[in-house]
Amino acid sequence: MVKLVLIRHGQSEWNVENRFTGWTDVDLSSKGLEEAREAGVMLKASGFSFDIAYTSVLRRAMRTLWITLEEMDLMWIPVYKTWKLNERHYGALQGLNKEETARKYGDEQVTLWRRSTNVRPPALTKDDERYEAAHPKYRDIKDYEFPLTEDLEDTEKRVVSYWNEEIAPNVKAGKQVIIAAHGNTIRALVKHLDQISDKDIENVNIPTGTPLVYELDNDLKPIGHYYLNREIETLEEKQV
């Protein structure tokens, strides 16, 4: 059996403001910084150590990982950053307040954009100032790969391809791996690992800054999973 740890970034500044974030590169809030520290403390106290780490190219996930590893005295381990672990791209919704958007388009439509597997939000245009394909951190993305909007299915395709090509071989080789990413990229990986249906994934939520531990067999099939609960600082099994 091997263990895999997934952690959604700590609370971000736009989580506080209730905005659609997507690929917008906002930082952690003060609470998010504390969540990342607590995650590191809990993981270390629970006996976890890591050989390798993966994260996105968005600072809220990278900073969460750095702080977590610092608390564990593991800042020296290899860290691989990839856009394929970025949050789902929310297209033209990025930056908009979720409540205001619901008032404009209706709760049902916004819920479809947020929770369904195959309904994309309105797309960005390439002349929009929020379109960041020219940023150096995206120099490895081909023009046709850079999203203007995504649904969860799109997100799952890129996350699972990176999992299969880069992460899974290391997990299978016995490496202790931590992935610091985002709500929807973790949902996408959880959907893949647990073979969750398109309908059931709509009800899956990933809390900020709380380590999610997967126990996997030699074929990387889940045996079980649980959260490390920051409130009681002990292992507590919870439904994902």
Swiss-Prot record:
One GO biological process term is: glycolytic process
What name appears for this protein in its UniProt entry? 2,3-bisphosphoglycerate-dependent phosphoglycerate mutase 2
Q: Name one GO molecular function term.
A: phosphoglycerate mutase activity
Q: What EC number(s) is this enzyme filed under?
A: 5.4.2.11
What's its catalytic activity? (2R)-2-phosphoglycerate = (2R)-3-phosphoglycerate
Disulfide feature:
none
Entry annotation: catalytic residues: 9, 87
- Which family, according to the similarity comment? Belongs to the phosphoglycerate mutase family. BPG-dependent PGAM subfamily.
